[in-house]
Amino acid sequence: MTEYFDLYTADRRKLGRKIQRGAPIPHGEYHIVVQIMSVNSLGEILLTQRVPQKTSGGRWECSGGCAVSGETSREAAVRELFEETGIRAFSSEIDLEWTMTTDSMLRDFYIVHKDVPLDRLVLQSSEVCAAKWVTYDRLCDMADNGQTTRTVARWLEIRGDDIRRCIDEIRRSARAGAPRICLL
């Protein structure tokens, strides 16, 4: 099935046009791309390994992808998480931590607190070949050694302190039995 993306201005106003996946995006126009980092009560991050035949095959990343036409950023994050891992999250459970504009993309980074054993995951075989929970420090080591996608390495470079702060807050909240609030 052919996928289409809605086009936006840099300030996220929908242009009323869409473009087919793979087609060049006109200069000054953007589409939405999401990443969603799943963090468990121990403060570990869920990573998925890209299948070898995909771009950056064999590298580790957080769930993510493009918002398809008619879909909000938040809806795309929830959908991508479920498609790639089988983890169900409600829109109200995911927190938009920050956004960044790069090239032709409006990139949105979400975090969700989910405790799911690896053997309960349902991996999307066309995208993902493995999954594991890692500590923040291990994730940084993996990024430094080229084991993650460039996107993950870039998020750590730009917002690593913020990511660590959110992970620490999830761990503290889980111990206290309180809902997580992480405002950046």
Predicted regions mapped to residue ranges:
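Acidic, metal-coordinating catalytic segment for phosphate/diphosphate chemistry
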Residues: 1-35, 41
